[in-house]
């Protein structure tokens, strides 16, 4: 059974990453799940258990992306980016830092995928219009994609990984925020420093800001633009209310997304059908299917091996526990994608004989590693693969070799510093 469960997992993962002839990841994952069920690797009760774990996470994620797609069509993100350019006042370094800060804000509230896939094309268009060379463009593109993941820690909704882990361990919105806001700030600061050190010679010292358009010119629907700010406030309150009412956060985000869609349906700035079609609905099928396959690894006893490893490193104290878990999840995410990694690790943490603060350290370090680890390799997350594809369509080609070289140099120090932020949070607060 162990061999069969492992084989089903590896073949499913291979087809998810390869996507031959555009094969949808949702179909691939469900096929793997179907094979796991009919071969007896997982039971029907496992299917219901997995669905119970992931439905809230995936629907929340889809709702947030829907909202972000509307905001993008309205022009909110471009409006924000133009403000950042004007605030830079022709200083290349300031522009670099401000774009990173904007990316961090977008990632926090609209998820890492939204930040990377929506903000990157906007930034790319801007630096091209300014007249930057290809060498000067590269740092801004990498920074836009990198910061989307490294600062997707603070809120449960900032990353699908966060939602799944929080749901699995029944962690509320406020408690999660209280544990991850400091690590996120550590990650943000470390990202700015490391990215600047790595790209300092390529970032232009100055640029001509005379031809940058006015922020208001980016707004495609002024009425909907004003409504957007109200929607954002209501969305934040929805997150907080879910903490106290125990109502799944997907209920709030879903209702808000639906109302926003209804308000936007008469706008000339966007096509509602295209927005709905552009949402990552296949993520729902992928999550359910992939996690059923992962449960096969649990049933075969493979996650118990990892649980024993976690018990071993926990014997060396909180600092070693956090570093060990963080780098294990980062490594696994980089070689087999962060989506299965976070649940495999979560199951192992639950199976381990680790309790109290040490267990808490494992839980949050797993999230950090699964959020940051994917930046090491192109296959670390589905969003990165799509991000690279979008850039290729816009005539910006980044080879896997170049990505890996850049990713590993930048990610390792940022991951280490972020884990230190988690350690300090747990021992001080």
From Swiss-Prot:
GO terms for molecular function: arsenite transmembrane transporter activity. One of its GO terms (cellular component) is plasma membrane. CDD domains: ArsB_permease (cd01118). It comes from the Bacteria. It is found in: Cell membrane. Coiled coil: none annotated. Its main location: membrane. It is a multi-pass membrane protein. The keyword Transport applies. GO terms for biological process: response to arsenic-containing substance. It holds the Pfam family ArsB. The chain crosses the membrane at residues 3-23, 25-45, 50-70, 99-119, 137-157, 180-200, 222-242, 244-264, 275-295, 316-336, 372-392, 408-428. Keywords: Arsenical resistance, Cell membrane, Membrane, Transmembrane, Transmembrane helix, Transport. NCBIfam families: 2a45 (TIGR00935), arsB_Sta_pI258 (NF033877), PRK15445.1 (NF011980). Involved in arsenical resistance. Thought to form the channel of an arsenite pump. Belongs to the ArsB family. This is Arsenical pump membrane protein. It comes from Staphylococcus aureus (strain MW2). The lineage of its organism: Bacteria, Bacillati, Bacillota, Bacilli, Bacillales.
